[in-house]
């Protein structure tokens, strides 16, 4: 197989543009598609930490990430009446240390997309069929076009359509960790400035913060529940579930929920892990949350995406496009790092959403444990060195 192979990358989140960057840098010809009409703005706050900060520097984007980072200066735990129980400096409140940075998902994707300006990118594009044989992969697009590629890399997230198309149901597991997460923006009606407020009790958590844009506040909800929605993707069912769950929670909860209809960036999902014995099948590979989501609560999905993208592209380079050899190495090199991060994801899920209100002692003990564990886990892989073409 010639090195300059044609590779279709699906998904313009974090992992998709990241793997396109490294593929292009290593001499391949990637093409990126995204089902949405444009880059989604805002979104959850993501951390760039550990080994991912090294990769970001290698990509030349670390300084840009720092410039666009969130700037929460203080975090406060409050009770149901709004009384402050405990206050922490913003970086510790977000479990960050050293050169680690928090940035909104949309801002990070925008930075990544600028690094691949020379890569063909097609929005509002999705796939209805994929078939592979010994020579190539035939892809049928929603608009009826039929194209052939040497390889396909799916970076289309935790609910990956490509994973469902290619892998049998017994080849992957979506493990619900017994909790849900929702975020959305609303007007900054409390007049918050670079501060994050959280109320956590009865296995539920409500937060609201505002930093770079003083007009906007970002609300967050987390809660434990074994209830499974009839349709996890139905936004109206999600919102009603949220209202029912937090009906009597107190604090600012009802004021936030009353403003929820004003939001245009509502996000809701089960806190879930994706587990697989192999992230590749034939000529198709999964990268990021599509293959190994550690859970949104872990704060590590972004870092796994950076590391996975780098190793997948690098191994294809070393193998000179021999995908069988490269995919075998990709699975082997990443396995222990993924396993450690997924174990951490379970531990974090069990450590949050406590029964009682968060006292100073509980908050500090939890912060110190997480800071110690995450430093080790986020640096728990030695990256191979791949020479650029």
Curated annotation (Swiss-Prot):
Family from the record: Belongs to the aromatic-ring hydroxylase family.
GO BP terms, alphabetized: response to antibiotic
Catalytic activity from the UniProt record: a tetracycline + NADPH + O2 + H(+) = a (1S,10aS)-3-(CONH2)-1-(Me2N)-3,3a,4,6-(HO)4-2,5-dioxo-1H,10aH,11H,11aH-cyclopenta[b]anthracene + CO + NADP(+) + H2O; 7-chlorotetracycline + NADPH + O2 + H(+) = (1S,10S,10aS)-3-(CONH2)-9-Cl-1-(Me2N)-3,3a,4,10-(HO)4-10-Me-2,5-dioxo-1H,10aH,11H,11aH-cyclopenta[b]anthracen-6-olate + CO + NADP(+) + H2O
A Pfam family this chain is assigned to: FAD_binding_3
The name this protein goes by in its record: Flavin-dependent monooxygenase
Loss of function: phenotype: Increase in bacterial tetracycline sensitivity.
Cofactor list: FAD
Function per UniProt: An FAD-requiring monooxygenase active on tetracycline antibiotic and some of its derivatives, which leads to their inactivation. Expression in E.coli confers high resistance to tetracycline and oxytetracycline, does not confer resistance to minocycline or tigecycline. The reaction requires NADPH. Expression in L.pneumophila confers resistance to tetracycline. Degrades and confers resistance to tetracycline and chlortetracycline.
Keywords noted in UniProt: Antibiotic resistance, FAD, Flavoprotein, NADP, Nucleotide-binding, Oxidoreductase
Free-text activity regulation comment from the record: Inhibited by anhydrotetracycline.
UniProt comment concerning the protein's domains: Consists of an N-terminal FAD-binding domain with a Rossman fold, a substrate-binding domain and a C-terminal helix that bridges the 2 domains close to the antibiotic-binding site. This last helix is flexible, is not found in TetX of Bacteroides species, and may contribute to their different substrate specificities.
Binding residues annotated for FAD, in chain numbering: 12-15, 34-35, 44, 105, 267, 289
Sample GO molecular function, one term: oxidoreductase activity
EC code(s) of this entry: 1.14.13.-
Gene3D superfamilies: D-Amino Acid Oxidase, subunit A, domain 2, FAD/NAD(P)-binding domain
Note describing how the cofactor binds: Binds 1 FAD per subunit.
InterPro entries noted in UniProt: FAD-bd (IPR002938), FAD/NAD-bd_sf (IPR036188), FAD_aromatic-hydroxylase (IPR051704)
Organism: Legionella longbeachae serogroup 1 (strain NSW150)
Note: Tetracycline antibiotics bind to the ribosomal acceptor site (A-site), preventing binding of the aminoacyl-tRNA to the A-site. The hydrophilic side of tetracycline makes many hydrogen-bonding interactions with oxygen atoms of the ribosome's phosphate backbone.
């Amino acid at each position: 197989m010639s090195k300059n192979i044609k590779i279709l990358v699906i998904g313009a989140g974090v992992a998709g543009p990241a793997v396109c960057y490294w593929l292009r840098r290593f001499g391949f010809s990637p093409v990126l598609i995204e089902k949405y009409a444009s880059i989604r703005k805002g979104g959850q706050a993501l951390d760039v930490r550990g080994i991912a900060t090294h990769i970001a520097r290698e990509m030349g984007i670390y300084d840009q990430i720092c410039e666009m980072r969130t700037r929460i200066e203080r975090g406060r735990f409050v009770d149901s009446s709004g009384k402050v129980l405990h206050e922490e400096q913003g970086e510790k409140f977000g479990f960050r240390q050293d050169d680690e940075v928090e940035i909104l998902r949309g801002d990070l994707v925008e930075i990544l997309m600028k690094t691949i300006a020379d890569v063909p990118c097609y929005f509002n594009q999705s796939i209805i069929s994929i078939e592979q044989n010994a020579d190539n992969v035939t892809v049928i697009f929603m608009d009826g076009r039929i194209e052939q590629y040497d390889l396909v890399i799916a970076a289309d997230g935790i609910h990956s359509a490509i994973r469902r198309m290619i892998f049998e149901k017994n080849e992957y597991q979506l493990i619900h960790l017994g909790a849900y997460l929702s975020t959305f923006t609303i007007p900054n009606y409390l007049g918050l400035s670079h501060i994050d407020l959280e109320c956590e009790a009865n296995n539920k958590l409500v937060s609201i913060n505002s930093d770079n844009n003083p007009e906007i506040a970002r609300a967050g909800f987390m809660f434990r529940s074994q209830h499974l929605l009839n349709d996890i993707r139905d936004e109206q069912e999600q919102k009603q579930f949220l209202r029912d769950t937090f009906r009597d929670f107190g604090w600012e909860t009802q004021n936030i929920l009353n403003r929820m209809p004003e939001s245009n960036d509502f996000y809701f999902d089960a806190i879930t892990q994706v587990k697989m014995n192999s992230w590749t099948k034939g000529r198709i590979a999964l990268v990021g949350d599509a293959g190994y989501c550690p859970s949104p609560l872990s704060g590590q999905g972004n870092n796994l995406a950076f590391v996975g993208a780098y190793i997948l592209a690098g191994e294809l380079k070393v193998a000179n496009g021999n995908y069988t050899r490269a995919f075998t190495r990709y699975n082997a090199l990443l396995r222990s790092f993924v396993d450690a991060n997924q174990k951490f994801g379970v531990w974090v899920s069990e450590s949050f959403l406590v029964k009682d209100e968060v006292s100073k002692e509980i908050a500090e003990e939890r912060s110190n444990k997480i800071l110690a564990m995450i430093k080790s886990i986020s640096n728990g892989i030695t990256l191979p060195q791949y020479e650029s073409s």
